[in-house]
Amino acid sequence: MKNAYELAENILKSKPDKNIELKSSDSFASIELYGTSACKKVQDTEFCECFHLENESGTGMITLYHVFPGIDLVYNDIHMEYCNKEQKPASSVMEINYCMEGRCECVFEQNEYGYIAAGDLSFCSLKKTGHVSEFPTSRYHGITITLDFSMITDEMKRILQLLSVNLEKISNISKTHSFTIIRANQSIEHIFLELYKIPEEITYGYIRVKILELLLVLTGFDLKKNNSEHVSA
């Protein structure tokens, strides 16, 4: 059995496998959140990919980082009225969204909807038919994190356990309700604000550190004691 240092070294030295999501027909890819037919890859570096979005309502740019196995982070710069009408269900995936600027409304089946504004955080299960994201001001800047629990490797799970991260508790946030919203909360918000102030030369390492911090904070977070709202679509 590998010790903690060997586990950490394997995870941190491994490079993102950008094709891992394409190895099976039913696998999930974070880019699907935006409607794959509307996406055009415009940049591809060692650690990230940039995509241009466009439909009749406007344009957008997203920057996607494969942070750890099963964990992605996306910077959203959207100037559109809506996107993602083709998202397929993904039973093992949780989507976390932080709104930096603007407003995002998520429309579900049966006309159920929830919204996030600046400073808000949302958790959404993708196990049902995908929702439509609408941007009433045609301007939205924020961060999306996807957790594909089926793709988080055993090595990664052991590292998270050593850091006292409880993945089961985090996944339960979106099991009871399809959409959970936490209104502006300082204990979480500072993590996302710092993700907008990263020196370019340490971007990838810094993102990894902040993702681990977020997972640890969410492990100890009590929704009942905070200003949370729910949509059961």
Which stretches of residues belong to each language-model region?
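N-terminal low-complexity or simple alpha-helical regulatory segments
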Residues: M1-A90
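Short hydrophobic/aromatic-rich motifs at helix boundaries and adjacent loops
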Residues: L33-Y34, T45, E49, M100-C104, ...
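Generic structural motif
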Residues: V67, I78-C83, E101-R103, D148-I152
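Short hydrophobic beta-strand segments that form the core of ligand-binding sensory/regulatory domains
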Residues: Y75-D77, E95-C99, H141-D148
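Glycine- and acidic-residue-biased ligand/ion/polar-headgroup-sensing regions
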Residues: A90-N111, F149
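Alpha-helical bundle regulatory/interaction domains
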Residues: V107-S232
